[in-house]
């Protein structure tokens, strides 16, 4: 039986659970596949993809900091990827790359189905405006978020994301220094890499951002999610959720695009959560 070759590209990538997740999905669904991880800097991404194709590669996941670079290599794009301006799933179709973004679908599915959150009518604060934020913002709006405020260390990138989303009545950009003046939010999403540079003693956000039902959600998992979720625990947000469930759900969406069948995510999530999950509240 021929082996289908897939991979995840990122920088760094040693921490990635994607090879393990897709191998487990393949075993569950009876699909024989080879799934590798490649640590590739942005300036080498296009060449690395060419080598991957030459060696039989037919699909790839893309993580930070390459999601916007992946958008640029695609000949065709899904509506979701085009709106996001970022790609996390590549499929080789008729000799060219087709780009999709499954991050937002994975996040919404994790929040609504696994954690039972109703996103309709919520006011959301999105921290970050890079590839991770771009991937989830459209799906959150589609899920019923009525107002989204985007805050980024570089305000120009927040403005660019607002423009790309094309919903000026719902989406606005503010400065990081304005956080204390924005009012409260039912949903606060960390789409930054601040967890890689902060610790539990230094990371903090204003308490004025919270109400009694605030859900604090980090798109990171493992140690990278600890500072943000430690803050969430300290201020007693109603929900504190890491990115592990989103990772598994977006992987299942990618698997379905490549193989035509969606695997059961619960068994994989349960095992990984016992090993890598950051304590939360849901």
Curated annotation (Swiss-Prot):
Catalytic activity: shikimate + NADP(+) = 3-dehydroshikimate + NADPH + H(+)
InterPro entries: Aminoacid_DH-like_N_sf (IPR046346), NAD(P)-bd_dom_sf (IPR036291), SDH_C (IPR041121), Shikimate_DH (IPR011342), Shikimate_DH-bd_N (IPR013708), Shikimate_DH_fam (IPR022893), Shikm_DH/Glu-tRNA_Rdtase (IPR006151)
Annotated positions binding NADP(+): 128-132, 243
Gene3D superfamilies per record: Leucine Dehydrogenase, chain A, domain 1, NAD(P)-binding Rossmann-like Domain
The enzyme's E.C. designation: 1.1.1.25
Any one GO molecular-function label of the UniProt entry: shikimate 3-dehydrogenase (NADP+) activity
Coiled-coil region: none
Pathway: Metabolic intermediate biosynthesis; chorismate biosynthesis; chorismate from D-erythrose 4-phosphate and phosphoenolpyruvate: step 4/7
Active site location: 67 (proton acceptor)
Alphabetic keyword roster: Amino-acid biosynthesis, Aromatic amino acid biosynthesis, NADP, Oxidoreductase
Binding site for shikimate: 16-18, 63, 88, 103
Function: Involved in the biosynthesis of the chorismate, which leads to the biosynthesis of aromatic amino acids. Catalyzes the reversible NADPH linked reduction of 3-dehydroshikimate (DHSA) to yield shikimate (SA).
Subunit comment: Homodimer.
Protein name: Shikimate dehydrogenase (NADP(+))
Gene (UniProt): aroE
